[in-house]
Amino acid sequence: MILREIRNKYGLTQKEAASLIGIPYRTYVRYEESDSFSNSYKYRKMVEDLGNLLRIDESHGILKLDHIKTTLIPILKSHNISFCYLFGSYARGDASQTSDVDLLVDADITGFDYLSLVEEIRQALSKKIDLLRLCDLKPGNPIIVEILKEGVRIL
């Protein structure tokens, strides 16, 4: 059942998983639902291919917006962040595998607390993080207006 676990971990349907690894849908379903294939070369290859395609790190994979939200909310709340906006390529929906995650937060944290927050988010999302604090930008800055208008509110 490793194949199903990998697919569920990334929130894919069987049809999406089959399409990703380039096999017919019915073949995928048969291999996922039967334990009799679990020791076959083809099954192991399907598991390997799906795992490699869905791997998320700084240079592989694209995060889903729902995953970003559900991962960030508890972290942001634990650091007493009053609001957070996602902006840039992830907010526009045109992120590439090497895209970083751009965030604007309203936070009163500095120094090691700030670095700790950045690192915690980086580890949780497995992507590079560009974290801007609202207090670092001058009021009326066009960047703020653009982020608030076109960004995605996380918290």
Where are the predicted features?
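Catalytic core of pol beta-like nucleotidyltransferases
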Residues: 1-83, 92-96, 108-155
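Short helix-loop-helix/strand-helix junction enriched in hydrophobic and basic residues
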Residues: 88-90
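Short beta-strand-loop elements within alpha/beta enzyme cores
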Residues: 99
